[in-house]
A protein has these predicted regions:
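Conserved Lys-Pro-Asp/Glu-containing loop-to-beta segment of HAD-superfamily phosphomonoesterases
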Residues: 181-214
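Asp-based phosphoryl-transfer active-site loop
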Residues: 2-23, 40-43, 218-219
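Short acidic low-complexity segments
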Residues: 1, 107-117
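Short, acidic loop-to-helix structural element flanking the phosphoryl-transfer center
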Residues: 18-41, 49-53, 69-77, 84-86, ...
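Substrate-recognition element of Asp-dependent hydrolases with the DxDx(T/V) motif
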Residues: 8-10, 30-58, 71, 90-94, ...
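Short, well-ordered secondary-structure micro-motifs within conserved domains or adaptor modules
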Residues: 114-130
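Acidic, Mg2+-coordinating phosphoryl-transfer loop and its flanking beta/alpha structural elements
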Residues: 207-229
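Glycine/Thr-rich beta-alpha phosphate-binding loop at enzyme active sites
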Residues: 148-185
Length: 229
């Protein structure tokens, strides 16, 4: 398989590891790709961590040497999307350090209350009512509503925890408006990953454990898929 594709887009949690649990087969798969000099990019809906943090986790905790350049998160894809719009300067953010760093890297001014050109929402484990209030008011006054992803649950060693989709659903209910969703299974993150690697859809395969996110992302983007379990 490593000779058939020029590039591999690979999910992380549930595919290469689960929480702190190592998947030996995942490590062997990455080693084979590295040995064959195949290009691969970890494409994750997790918006809470920076690429450096993701790479460090893979390297230090899962014995998979990784650089930040081999990581593409939904937060990075969201920042790329807003930058391409060209009319967004002030962003009201609900999220964690991964989303913050991605937005700041693109030069956006982050605000905690309106006015704002866009509201960017991802998983925020410090969410509170006031954050939802400010985001609601900003969207009601015309801010674009953009979500990193709408995963309902976040799998880890504790079980299936509430995901970013839980927060997005609350805000969507408040504003009675659907967001632009960036992460898998939407095509925006896949298009960003293709641009990042310089490859075309027919040159890559999407590898993941979740049909509703990873596999549908490939299908929606006309990219071959490989479901692992």
């Amino acid at each position: 398989m490593a000779q058939h594709y020029d590039g591999y887009f690979i999910d992380l949690d549930g595919t290469i590891y689960q929480g702190t649990k190592r998947f030996p087969a995942g490590k062997r798969f990455i080693e084979r790709l590295a040995e064959s000099s195949s290009q691969y990019l970890f494409v994750t809906n997790n918006s809470t961590k920076t690429p450096d943090e993701v790479a460090a986790n893979l390297t230090d905790n899962h014995d998979i040497p990784t650089t930040a350049e081999q990581v593409y998160t939904s937060a990075m894809a969201l920042a790329d999307y807003l930058a391409e719009l060209g009319d967004v300067k002030r962003v009201l953010m609900i999220g964690e350090i991964g989303l913050q760093v991605a937005l700041e890297a693109k030069g956006f001014e982050l605000v905690s209350e309106g006015p704002a050109d866009a509201v960017a929402i991802g998983l925020d484990r410090d969410i509170n009512y006031e954050k939802l209030v400010q985001a609601t008011l900003a969207i009601q006054h015309g801010a674009k509503f953009v979500a990193t992803n709408v995963d309902t649950n976040l799998p880890n060693e504790r079980g299936m925890l509430p995901g970013a989709g839980t927060l997005v659903a609350a805000l969507q209910t408040a504003v009675q408006q659907k967001p632009v969703v960036i992460g898998k299974p939407e095509t925006i993150i896949m298009a960003g990953a293709l641009r990042r690697t310089g490859l075309t859809a027919d040159q890559v395969v999407m590898v993941g454990d979740n049909y509703n996110t990873d596999i549908l992302a490939g299908i929606n983007a006309d990219i071959d898929t490989l479901l692992v379990y």
